[in-house]
């Protein structure tokens, strides 16, 4: 790890991503952004197939995994996540969307808003993505400019429906494919898009002063060095020599010391809230840490099984349930980076919950999870998202 190039923190760092309906051009836009910025010396061009990297997608052209690319504008350093578009893989968006300070919503002018457009806006709202910039894609394929105006109005209305400022959200029109193919006019549109992202999505106020917390996304072993846990730092900071606890999924809390830190395959002196990092842990075996746990400052977070949550239950049109549910319903609760089954107890006087309802209820999980007031989660059943919410009270 030591001999790697050093990651220099010069420009402010922002996490963004592309969201929107399958085949509307999210990955093409991501490729176009890196290609245009590479011409300006601010990025390495990533082609579509590099971003679209998971092997099982190739046959169907559907993005499954979450791709991270990095690039710079004149003002900022960006980590850009290409969120999966296909409903089957919405689970990955849930882990991914939580990593975004802002999002570029891609809507094909040929189609207008589609079911997943709505689902992604809802999820963005629930996982705390505060700012959305709209890219109306494929405008070269629409002959009538009034149709494009109509699509823009539809998108603005949809954003307003989910408490985004639909009237004020910036909307950029262009063709990602034409920009990727080198059309100078469309390349300028991409530059304009990134200027807009620079201006409209504020540099996030990081939670660097709070105690360190990092949900574990992945675990791997470096031969001769030890076990690395990787993920996005939720809050606080971490550096080599810090003591950390591994919390969640079991009652036992493992203690360790950070012996190495890297970001984008470069060593890092200090990891801060918002950074995607790999943390090398002293004396920890591969089987002592797993996805779904958290690394945390000692004593800062505990595991719990019982909590109250405020939850929005998706309606049928959003891809949710078609029927109500009752007390004793046992779906999956997706916390941080993993699913845990939980039993729902509805409040007194509430006999059932209908799709589209907003409700507070009590949950008992089958495994202890590192949670606290404000921790966000989604509720899933049979591979699809049926609700989203956050912890309002810890009960144990």
From Swiss-Prot:
Residues 175-177 are annotated as: G5. Its main location: cytoplasm. InterPro entries: EF-Tu_GTP-bd, EF-Tu_GTPase, EFTu-like_2, EFTU_2, G_TR_CS, P-loop_NTPase, Small_GTP-bd, T_Tr_GTP-bd_dom. Residues 20-27 are annotated as: G1. Residues 137-140 are annotated as: G4. Residues 11-205 form the tr-type G domain. It is found in: Cytoplasm. Residues 61-65 are annotated as: G2. Residues 82-85 are annotated as: G3. One of its GO terms (biological process) is adhesion of symbiont to host epithelial cell. GO terms for cellular component: cytoplasm; cytosol; external side of cell wall; Gram-positive-bacterium-type cell wall; plasma membrane. Signal peptide: none annotated. SUPFAM superfamilies: EF-Tu/eEF-1alpha/eIF2-gamma C-terminal domain, P-loop containing nucleoside triphosphate hydrolases, Translation proteins. Mg(2+) binds at residue 27. Its EC number is 3.6.5.3. Keywords: Cytoplasm, Elongation factor, GTP-binding, Hydrolase, Magnesium, Metal-binding, Nucleotide-binding, Protein biosynthesis. Monomer. NCBIfam families: EF-Tu (TIGR00485), PRK00049.1 (NF000766), PRK12735.1 (NF009372), PRK12736.1 (NF009373), small_GTP (TIGR00231). GTP hydrolase that promotes the GTP-dependent binding of aminoacyl-tRNA to the A-site of ribosomes during protein biosynthesis. This is Elongation factor Tu.
């Amino acid at each position: 790890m030591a001999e790697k190039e050093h990651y220099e923190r010069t420009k402010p760092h922002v996490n963004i991503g592309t969201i929107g309906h399958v085949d509307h051009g999210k990955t093409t836009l991501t490729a176009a952004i890196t290609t245009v910025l590479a011409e300006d010396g601010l990025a390495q061009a990533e082609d579509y197939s590099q971003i679209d990297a998971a092997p099982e997608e190739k046959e169907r052209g559907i993005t499954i995994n979450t791709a991270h690319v990095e690039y710079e504008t004149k003002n900022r350093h960006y980590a850009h996540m290409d969120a999966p578009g296909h409903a089957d893989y919405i689970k990955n968006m849930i882990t991914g969307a939580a990593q975004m300070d802002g999002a570029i919503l891609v809507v094909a002018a040929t189609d207008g808003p589609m079911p997943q457009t709505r689902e992604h806006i809802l999820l963005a709202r629930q996982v705390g993505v505060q700012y959305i910039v709209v890219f109306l894609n494929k405008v070269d394929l629409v002959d009538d400019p009034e149709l494009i105006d109509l699509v823009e109005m539809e998108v603005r209305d949809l954003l307003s429906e989910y408490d985004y400022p639909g009237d004020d959200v910036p909307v950029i029109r262009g063709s990602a494919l034409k920009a990727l193919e080198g059309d100078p006019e469309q390349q300028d549109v991409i530059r304009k898009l990134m200027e807009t992202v620079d201006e409209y999505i504020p540099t996030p106020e990081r939670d660097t002063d709070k105690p360190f917390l990092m949900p574990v996304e992945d675990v791997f072993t470096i031969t001769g060095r030890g076990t690395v846990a990787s993920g996005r730092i939720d809050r606080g900071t971490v550096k080599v020599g810090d003591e950390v606890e591994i919390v969640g999924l079991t009652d036992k809390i493992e203690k360790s010391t950070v012996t190495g830190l890297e970001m984008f395959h470069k060593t890092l002196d200090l990891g801060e809230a918002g950074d995607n990092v790999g943390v090398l842990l002293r004396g920890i075996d591969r089987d002592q840490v797993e996805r779904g746990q958290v690394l945390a400052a000692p004593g800062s977070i505990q595991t719990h099984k019982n909590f109250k949550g405020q939850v929005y239950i998706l309606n049928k049109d959003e891809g949710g349930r078609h029927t109500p549910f009752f007390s004793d319903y046992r779906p999956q609760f997706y916390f941080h980076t993993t699913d845990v089954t939980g039993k729902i107890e509805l409040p007194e006087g509430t006999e059932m919950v209908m799709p589209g309802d907003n409700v507070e209820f009590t949950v008992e999980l089958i495994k202890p999870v590192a949670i606290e007031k404000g921790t966000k989660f989604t509720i899933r059943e049979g591979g699809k998202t049926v609700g989203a919410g956050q912890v309002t009270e810890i009960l144990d």
